[in-house]
């Protein structure tokens, strides 16, 4: 085993430094070394030793195991093991198991046209790149859920352990059911240093460290030392103990029905940073110090550095590790598992291999009956929740669907799912608790990071899910979204990576209905962030009512390798489309609402476009005012569900061709666009369109407070009155005919201000507005006064 460790260390150093002469079959020269040295050595030897010992128990016990490494900058390590196990050559036949293959393996690392420095999607066996630190445990627990035979060995770097998401990630054990789920074996890689500083967990007494992890609900096992022979013995014993404890816990739960939360084992692995590299270089400490974090020697134009590198690599005795052709010796190769038991070839690390379609009810069965536009009222999110309840019910037996939320499931109106499942919870449960159970499939923890990380781990290992969150607070995982989008982008370019289920976001409690919580809860900017990513990855939907939301939800759950963002409200609101109309509208992604328009057979005077449920409501109210006061005006109403339809077809696969866009929006008529989010996003998406100069967008412009629902749109000039004023200002031909109308609009806004400041609620003429009923009508129930979450 020590020889196998030396082989993986040799390959790790070779990837960082060598361009040629992979077996050091001739004296090392400057031309054998890369001109630019990139990569990270410091964590690699520790990762290598852990991998070798995990292989021992996998082979001995025929285990199904994955390796998730938080310090993903140790890319040379996982690539080395994938190569030594043969997996690398299977998926990349050009990297053969001989001296020439070794040369190519070394050259390609962190080299133009080669592979990245981290455990990116190109690395067989990886589901976690580890470039942005903090999510290793979240991904590991997500992978373990509903995988009862899987053990996820999760290495946590001591630097990563200082991040917020990782600090919360330890609590994943409060949601892991030993009867139903697999196991996560956390391994704290305590090598003492980050890039240029010590790690605080390495500088506190062992007793304090032990108490910390015991307080987290773990039974820590310590492996500590500098001498490899001693550490080999300690690590072997610790793994044997950990696996025995895991088997005991799982047997007790699965055979005896004991679901009391156990103290799962974990390992504290304290070894030197940069282990086995030169102790000093140029008179400065290197091994067991931060200088070994990346490339211990950067200036290879110094002959002395070449001699040091050669001596370092020869210290691993490559002649004992590889035969004359450059192949790993048969004796060492026999130490590794074979086939799918190899961690580099575990199918869970290529989740698309295991992905099975969800059993889906017909979403049309959940339709809201709409006799005429605006006649019915419904809570769109609650209707969606009823549909998801039955998706959950149909897939309980297969155990491949979960919902995730940071304590916002009920607030976002998905409580119907609790009719068929509970909230997963392994801590103490009291009699008065609401739907808590170790067997629950609703994952609620007040951490957007854990919700996102668990879902990613769940998806990456071949399952399905949906993430519900307040719109403003989804920003907390902006960078996690980034990393998953990057992962999917690269996976699309790797033939052996199979497609996985899409990552689906449902954003509710949105900006226009956060009047009760105030300014801190008002931010629609996540969609701006999303559209920065690759067009073949991201999708953004803003359904205007429940039936369109049902159609979009069904589509998202059937899609693969996308990130779908769905934004819709949870408050009672008018319903516009029948189910048949909704399906057609969502299929097209946008279109003219003929029933709201009066320009058929002629050119419109103005186009009124809307995207989002509240902007749609305000647009239709504005159109009705225009019909009443300027009946001769020809108005075309366009609603947008699929935001990416606005981009040209050359920019996004869903984008409308210019000819079709011009036919809808005209080439020269004013366009008043009421948008759910920040208005400049619409300008970004449409700046190349013919009629962009006539496009005027209203949306959220960072005005908000605790106020009434209608005042929110007034503050941002998205209300019906400002929209009407925008039309008048852009149609000079109206002249004096519009003067009195415009004055009446200003007076109505003054009335609004006086009314809310006196009574604390919107005017009945606003809250009671109804399409087709004139300026006032039966209440639609858009108030949020009863909603304090």
From Swiss-Prot:
EC number: 4.1.2.-
Keyword Lyase attached: yes
PROSITE patterns (alphabetical): PHOSPHOKETOLASE_1, PHOSPHOKETOLASE_2
CDD domains listed in its UniProt record: TPP_PK
Cofactor(s) recorded in Swiss-Prot or TrEMBL: thiamine diphosphate
BP-aspect Gene Ontology terms: carbohydrate metabolic process
Pfam family name, one: XFP
Domain of life: Bacteria
Transmembrane regions: none
Entry keywords, A to Z: Lyase, Thiamine pyrophosphate
The keyword Lyase appears for this protein: yes
Any GO MF annotation of the entry: aldehyde-lyase activity
Family indicated by similarity: Belongs to the XFP family.
PANTHER family the record matches: PHOSPHOKETOLASE-RELATED
Protein name as it appears in the record: Probable phosphoketolase 1
UniProt source species: Rhizobium meliloti (strain 1021) (Ensifer meliloti)
Organism taxonomic ancestry: Bacteria, Pseudomonadati, Pseudomonadota, Alphaproteobacteria, Hyphomicrobiales
